[in-house]
Structures are given as structure tokens and as C-alpha cells.
């Protein structure tokens, strides 16, 4: 956790007002919360509350070092879209836990272990706004702003998503 806080402090000292923690797509923070990858039997495994302990430690350390005015945007996979991976229900449960330690939740999907089903942005074969359904479902359960990412290619589509309250920002 200290190394993440150190990097956040460097960003703050350079004038940045926030950091984006990449807790999705199978990277380390995601590996702790994913049932596909976290098979630990200690205090960091088992329930979602236990699996969320390390991401929480990272967020708390960043706030401790950088202050509450330094924002944390937490990027998470709302679903890993692969067998044995996080489901939307898991994503909602994690978002409900992590929301008290972050300022913004950024919803993507997939994992680098499964490139076919990773939806950081849409291809020409996917619907545009391919993660909006995940972001909208998570938004219903949290009190912090939610970002949806995934191929928003038209201003009208963005306006519609925002007006419908499905997300607070798009990326």
C-alpha cells in the first residue's frame, strides 16, 4: 500500500489533484477481489469483505499520505465476463464496500487474461457504451459518482446516458 501512496504523493507534488487506481482488467488490485484468481485461505481470501482488504489498505494509505482533498478514482471491472470470474453481483458488492474509501468509481469490464471479453472500449462488433449496463447497475448501489467507459462514440449517446442517470461521467 505504501508504494501506491508514494506514487500518489509524487502525482500530487507535481500538481495533480487526483489519481486513477486501476483495480480492473486482472491487474493486482483486481486479482485480490476476483474469485477466479484469489484462492487465499488467510484474511485476504474468502468473502468479498476479506478480498477487498488490500484495495482498501491502498486507498486508505493514499488518503493518509495525500489528504482527503486528493481524489481517488477507482477503476474496476463491473464483471470479468469470464467463467469463474467476477459477476455483476460481485462488482456491486465490491463497489458497495470500496465506495467509502474512494471519490469516484470507474466501471469497465473484463480481464487481460481474456482479451475477447474485455470491454474497455467497444469494437466495431460491440454495441457502443458496452459497459453502461454495468455502470448503471452499480450506480444504483453507491453514493459516489460513477464513470462508464466503453466506446461512447456519439455525443447524443453520452447525453442520453447522463440524462437517464445511468452514470455521472463517461470516459
Predicted features along the sequence, with ranges:
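Flavin-dependent oxidoreductase catalytic cores
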Residues: 1-171
